Curated annotation (Swiss-Prot):
<dbReference type="GO" id="GO:0016491">
    <property type="term" value="F:oxidoreductase activity"/>
</dbReference>
<comment type="similarity">
    <text>Belongs to the tyrosinase family.</text>
</comment>
<dbReference type="InterPro" id="IPR008922">
    <property type="entry name" value="Di-copper_centre_dom_sf"/>
</dbReference>
<feature type="binding site">
    <location>
        <position position="145"/>
    </location>
    <ligand>
        <name>Cu cation A</name>
    </ligand>
</feature>
<protein>
    <recommendedName>
        <fullName>Tyrosinase-like protein</fullName>
    </recommendedName>
</protein>
<feature type="binding site">
    <location>
        <position position="322"/>
    </location>
    <ligand>
        <name>Cu cation B</name>
    </ligand>
</feature>
<keyword id="KW-0964">Secreted</keyword>
<keyword id="KW-0479">Metal-binding</keyword>
<feature type="binding site">
    <location>
        <position position="163"/>
    </location>
    <ligand>
        <name>Cu cation A</name>
    </ligand>
</feature>
<keyword id="KW-0732">Signal</keyword>
<keyword id="KW-0186">Copper</keyword>
<dbReference type="Pfam" id="PF00264">
    <property type="entry name" value="Tyrosinase"/>
</dbReference>
<feature type="binding site">
    <location>
        <position position="299"/>
    </location>
    <ligand>
        <name>Cu cation B</name>
    </ligand>
</feature>
<feature type="binding site">
    <location>
        <position position="295"/>
    </location>
    <ligand>
        <name>Cu cation B</name>
    </ligand>
</feature>
<dbReference type="GO" id="GO:0046872">
    <property type="term" value="F:metal ion binding"/>
</dbReference>
<dbReference type="InterPro" id="IPR002227">
    <property type="entry name" value="Tyrosinase_Cu-bd"/>
</dbReference>
<dbReference type="InterPro" id="IPR050316">
    <property type="entry name" value="Tyrosinase/Hemocyanin"/>
</dbReference>
Length: 456
């Protein structure tokens, strides 16, 4: 046996040991490795015992998929595997200590972080992006959200679970740089409650937070943020917030998801489900409430890179927004339990009947099945959420406590710190057409988020 073959087997053996604690998964669509993932995860080779040929075959097939689907290099695949090994080790250690009190990192609303907490988090995000190692770790993670993911992780039941796993990887990457940082969530219902005329004046689009809201981002911690070549019409991160296209997360939708006793199964709030509750806007237009639909509206509202599938994660806002979507889902899961429903088994299977099937391998994370994203493991072992309170919002310089004990965003009033960056030449004016819920295509990547509403 030559040295390279031996080293390759050692690496794969280490990988198999590292994921030995992983949730079982079986790929029913690939006959040549059917059942292999589950068998490999159940077994843990001892000492110098070689990994079985079937296990080697299964994981080499995964590596081939990642290369063909995402065009990842060997270094990028190894990087993602290393994040998974760390995550599974964390889960395993927490399970071993389940009878003891275990501290879990707390995800809070971004504006309720202390000044130091927020600066540390934003600096760590910037450090992940600006790292010059090969591969660039931020770009590798962002590329997991490229076009091949669209039919697997959007427009159906797997949207929630896939993005939950995706956030976990991203947070693990941040904590490698600084171990005490935790993701925060951007609750855009605080913007919604300002009223439509004031949405764009929210203080988060300032140098203290996310930077300017239009044009190339030239202020704040994410200024002069390079984009991979050819991804958009711009070489740098840009936004294009425009009134009448998209909107913040509707607080009426959030209230229904949190409290309506008639929406207690996932089919009532997932894309292509039967949708129980509706919202009627000021023009008399009615839409069903789904978490994914409300999520799409925020992408369209921020615009720019956020308005299209491929470049969306290049804007750090993406992860703060999706952290809120995950928070909303967790609040819904808590409501399900109050009504004696089990969120871990209530997988509706809406969307593409094959790719969103409960037992289909989760694209990009093939050691999970889609239904594994609905597990309680994440909020029991990796993180938990803290809901905003009016008392906390009262003491924050970026929020106020409004009527009905609702937290509302503070504003940068017109004429105060509303800097805009250079406009993107030939950049898309609108990501999507609202009429008919159809997509307008970007000149560079052709994929966006379907809008569900364009006004209050």
């Amino acid at each position: 046996m030559n040295t390279m073959t031996l080293l390759g087997k050692v690496f794969l053996l280490q990988f198999l040991i590292g994921v030995g604690f992983c949730m079982l998964m079986q790929d029913p669509k690939r006959n040549d490795t059917k059942g292999t993932y589950a068998a490999c995860f159940r077994s843990q080779p001892q000492g110098n015992e070689p990994a079985s040929p079937d296990c080697l075959k299964a994981f080499m097939a995964y590596a081939e998929d990642m290369k063909n689907i995402f065009h990842f290099t060997k270094e990028q695949i190894n990087y993602l595997w290393s994040l998974e090994r760390e995550t599974q080790s964390l889960l395993h250690n927490h399970r071993r200590r389940k009878r003891q009190a275990v501290y879990l990192p707390v995800r809070k609303e971004c504006r309720l972080l202390s000044e130091l907490e927020r600066q540390n988090l934003f600096y760590t995000v910037r450090s992940l992006k600006m790292d010059t190692s090969n591969p660039n770790e931020y770009d590798t993670l962002a590329n997991l959200h490229r076009g091949a993911v669209q039919p697997h992780a959007h427009d159906g039941s797997n949207f929630l679970g896939w993005h939950r796993v995706y956030l976990m990887y991203y947070e693990r990457a941040l904590r490698r740089i600084r171990g005490d940082v935790t993701l925060c969530f951007w609750d855009t219902t605080m913007e919604f409650n300002l009223g439509m005329d004031n949405w764009e004046y929210t203080a988060v689009f300032s140098s203290d937070f996310f930077g300017n809201r239009r044009g190339q981002v030239i202020t704040g911690p994410f200024r002069d943020w390079p984009l991979p070549p050819g991804l958009t019409e711009s070489d740098y991160l840009y936004r294009n917030m425009t009134r009448g296209r998209g909107m913040p997360f509707d607080s009426r939708a959030a209230s229904s998801i949190f409290y309506n006793p008639n929406t207690i199964i996932h089919s009532t709030i997932t894309w292509e489900g039967f949708g129980f509750d509706t919202i009627t806007n000021s023009q008399g237009q009615t839409r069903n409430i789904t978490i994914e639909g409300e999520h799409n509206n925020v992408h369209n509202w921020v615009g720019g890179a956020m308005g299209f599938l491929d470049p969306a994660p290049q804007d750090p806002i993406f992860f703060f927004h999706h952290c809120y979507i995950d928070y909303v889902w967790e609040r819904f899961r808590e409501k399900m339990r109050r009504y004696f429903r089990d969120p871990t088994t209530d997988y509706p299977g809406h969307g593409n009947e094959t790719l969103h099937d409960a037992n289909y391998p989760m694209i990009g994370f093939e050691w999970y099945r889609n239904i594994d994203g609905y597990s309680d493991y994440f909020t029991q072992n990796v993180y938990r959420y803290e809901s905003p309170t009016c008392q906390a919002c009262y003491y924050s310089p970026y929020t106020v406590c409004g009527q009905g004990n609702q937290c509302i965003a503070r504003m940068n009033y017109p004429g105060t710190e509303i800097e805009e960056g250079p406009q993107v030449p030939n950049g898309p004016v609108a990501a999507f057409s609202v009429a008919g819920g159809t997509m307008m295509m970007s000149a560079s990547n052709g994929r966006g988020f379907i809008a569900t509403s364009n006004s209050e």
